[in-house]
Protein backbone atom coordinates (compact mmCIF):
# COMPACT_ATOMS: atom_id res chain seq x y z
CA UNK A 1 0.00 0.00 0.00
CA UNK A 2 1.06 3.57 -0.61
CA UNK A 3 2.43 5.69 2.20
CA UNK A 4 -0.20 8.12 3.50
CA UNK A 5 0.48 11.70 4.56
CA UNK A 6 -0.34 12.84 8.09
CA UNK A 7 -0.16 16.58 8.69
CA UNK A 8 0.02 17.73 12.30
CA UNK A 9 -1.73 19.14 14.18
CA UNK A 10 -4.78 17.10 13.25
CA UNK A 11 -8.23 18.63 13.64
CA UNK A 12 -9.63 15.54 15.40
CA UNK A 13 -7.89 12.53 16.95
CA UNK A 14 -9.89 10.25 14.66
CA UNK A 15 -7.57 11.33 11.83
CA UNK A 16 -4.73 9.44 13.51
CA UNK A 17 -6.94 6.51 14.44
CA UNK A 18 -7.89 6.07 10.77
CA UNK A 19 -4.21 5.71 9.80
CA UNK A 20 -3.18 3.37 12.61
CA UNK A 21 -1.17 0.40 11.30
CA UNK A 22 -0.43 2.14 7.99
CA UNK A 23 2.78 3.51 6.54
CA UNK A 24 2.69 7.29 7.00
CA UNK A 25 4.83 10.33 6.34
CA UNK A 26 4.31 12.88 9.10
CA UNK A 27 4.97 16.59 8.77
CA UNK A 28 3.75 19.85 10.24
CA UNK A 29 2.77 21.57 7.03
CA UNK A 30 5.13 24.45 6.40
CA UNK A 31 6.77 24.17 9.82
CA UNK A 32 9.26 21.54 10.92
CA UNK A 33 8.54 19.04 13.67
CA UNK A 34 10.33 20.07 16.87
CA UNK A 35 12.00 17.77 19.40
CA UNK A 36 10.12 18.29 22.65
CA UNK A 37 11.05 15.18 24.61
CA UNK A 38 14.30 13.23 24.50
CA UNK A 39 14.10 11.68 27.96
CA UNK A 40 13.74 8.11 26.64
CA UNK A 41 15.90 8.51 23.53
CA UNK A 42 18.98 6.76 24.92
CA UNK A 43 17.00 4.15 26.83
CA UNK A 44 14.36 3.15 24.26
CA UNK A 45 15.15 5.04 21.04
CA UNK A 46 12.08 7.29 21.35
CA UNK A 47 11.79 11.01 20.54
CA UNK A 48 8.78 13.22 21.30
CA UNK A 49 7.93 15.66 18.48
CA UNK A 50 5.59 18.63 18.27
CA UNK A 51 4.05 20.37 15.27
CA UNK A 52 3.70 23.61 17.24
CA UNK A 53 7.31 24.22 18.22
CA UNK A 54 8.78 23.91 21.68
CA UNK A 55 6.29 23.06 24.41
CA UNK A 56 5.88 24.92 27.67
CA UNK A 57 4.01 24.24 30.87
CA UNK A 58 0.49 25.63 30.64
CA UNK A 59 0.97 28.07 33.51
CA UNK A 60 4.17 29.44 31.99
CA UNK A 61 2.05 31.27 29.42
CA UNK A 62 -1.45 31.24 30.97
CA UNK A 63 -3.13 31.93 34.28
CA UNK A 64 -4.05 28.73 36.17
CA UNK A 65 -7.39 27.37 34.96
CA UNK A 66 -8.81 23.86 35.16
CA UNK A 67 -10.85 24.30 31.97
CA UNK A 68 -8.01 26.09 30.19
CA UNK A 69 -5.56 23.35 31.10
CA UNK A 70 -7.94 20.64 29.85
CA UNK A 71 -8.31 22.50 26.54
CA UNK A 72 -4.53 22.93 26.33
CA UNK A 73 -3.99 19.17 26.81
CA UNK A 74 -6.61 18.40 24.17
CA UNK A 75 -4.89 20.65 21.62
CA UNK A 76 -1.47 19.32 22.58
CA UNK A 77 -2.60 15.74 21.94
CA UNK A 78 -3.45 16.71 18.34
CA UNK A 79 -0.01 18.22 17.71
CA UNK A 80 2.36 15.71 19.35
CA UNK A 81 3.70 12.40 18.04
CA UNK A 82 6.50 10.06 19.07
CA UNK A 83 9.24 8.80 16.77
CA UNK A 84 10.22 5.27 17.80
CA UNK A 85 13.00 2.96 16.60
CA UNK A 86 10.62 -0.02 16.19
CA UNK A 87 12.47 -1.98 18.86
CA UNK A 88 11.49 -2.95 22.39
CA UNK A 89 15.14 -3.38 23.38
CA UNK A 90 16.18 -1.30 26.38
CA UNK A 91 19.48 0.57 26.31
CA UNK A 92 20.35 -0.39 22.71
CA UNK A 93 23.98 -0.29 21.63
CA UNK A 94 23.06 2.03 18.75
CA UNK A 95 20.33 4.67 18.92
CA UNK A 96 19.21 5.61 15.42
CA UNK A 97 17.80 9.05 16.04
CA UNK A 98 20.20 11.98 16.36
CA UNK A 99 21.43 14.90 14.30
CA UNK A 100 22.24 14.59 10.61
CA UNK A 101 20.85 11.06 10.27
CA UNK A 102 23.76 9.72 12.31
CA UNK A 103 23.45 7.56 15.46
CA UNK A 104 23.23 9.17 18.88
CA UNK A 105 26.60 9.65 20.59
CA UNK A 106 28.33 11.97 23.03
CA UNK A 107 29.51 14.04 20.07
CA UNK A 108 26.19 13.85 18.19
CA UNK A 109 23.42 14.63 20.64
CA UNK A 110 19.76 15.39 20.17
CA UNK A 111 18.52 18.48 21.99
CA UNK A 112 15.01 19.72 22.60
CA UNK A 113 14.33 22.38 20.02
CA UNK A 114 16.13 20.50 17.22
CA UNK A 115 13.92 20.00 14.17
CA UNK A 116 13.08 17.58 11.38
CA UNK A 117 10.89 18.18 8.33
CA UNK A 118 9.26 14.75 7.97
CA UNK A 119 9.30 11.28 9.50
CA UNK A 120 8.15 8.10 7.78
CA UNK A 121 7.17 4.76 9.29
CA UNK A 122 4.22 2.74 10.56
CA UNK A 123 1.76 4.58 12.82
CA UNK A 124 0.66 2.86 16.01
CA UNK A 125 -0.79 3.84 19.37
CA UNK A 126 0.52 2.79 22.76
CA UNK A 127 1.84 4.09 26.07
CA UNK A 128 1.94 7.86 25.70
CA UNK A 129 0.05 8.32 22.44
CA UNK A 130 0.65 7.82 18.76
CA UNK A 131 4.04 6.70 17.49
CA UNK A 132 5.76 6.35 14.15
CA UNK A 133 7.80 3.16 14.12
CA UNK A 134 10.78 3.50 11.78
CA UNK A 135 13.96 1.53 11.24
CA UNK A 136 15.64 4.31 9.27
CA UNK A 137 17.71 7.02 10.96
CA UNK A 138 15.98 10.38 11.23
CA UNK A 139 17.77 13.46 9.91
CA UNK A 140 17.38 15.97 12.75
CA UNK A 141 18.77 19.45 12.21
CA UNK A 142 20.62 21.24 15.01
CA UNK A 143 18.46 24.30 15.65
CA UNK A 144 19.17 24.46 19.38
CA UNK A 145 22.94 24.27 19.74
CA UNK A 146 24.61 24.45 23.10
CA UNK A 147 25.69 27.95 24.05
CA UNK A 148 29.32 28.73 23.40
CA UNK A 149 31.56 28.49 26.44
CA UNK A 150 31.67 31.82 28.22
CA UNK A 151 35.18 32.97 29.00
CA UNK A 152 35.16 35.58 31.72
CA UNK A 153 38.22 35.96 33.89
CA UNK A 154 36.24 38.19 36.25
CA UNK A 155 33.49 35.65 36.88
CA UNK A 156 33.10 34.01 40.25
CA UNK A 157 30.92 31.18 41.35
CA UNK A 158 29.98 30.37 44.91
CA UNK A 159 28.27 27.08 45.74
CA UNK A 160 26.58 26.22 49.00
CA UNK A 161 24.74 23.15 50.17
CA UNK A 162 23.06 21.91 53.30
CA UNK A 163 22.23 18.28 54.09
CA UNK A 164 18.72 18.34 55.55
CA UNK A 165 18.78 14.56 56.05
CA UNK A 166 21.27 15.01 58.89
CA UNK A 167 19.61 18.05 60.44
CA UNK A 168 19.06 17.48 64.15
CA UNK A 169 19.97 19.33 67.30
CA UNK A 170 21.56 16.48 69.25
CA UNK A 171 18.77 15.87 71.80
CA UNK A 172 17.30 12.96 69.85
CA UNK A 173 14.49 15.14 68.51
CA UNK A 174 14.40 16.35 64.96
Task: Annotate each PLM feature.
Residues 1-174:
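Extended non-catalytic accessory segments flanking core domains
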Amino acid sequence: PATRELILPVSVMGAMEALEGMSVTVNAGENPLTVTNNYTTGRYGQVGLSATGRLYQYTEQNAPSVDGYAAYLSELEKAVIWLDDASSEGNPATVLHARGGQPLSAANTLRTGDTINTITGVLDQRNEGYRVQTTEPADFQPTNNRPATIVDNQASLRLASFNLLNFWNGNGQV
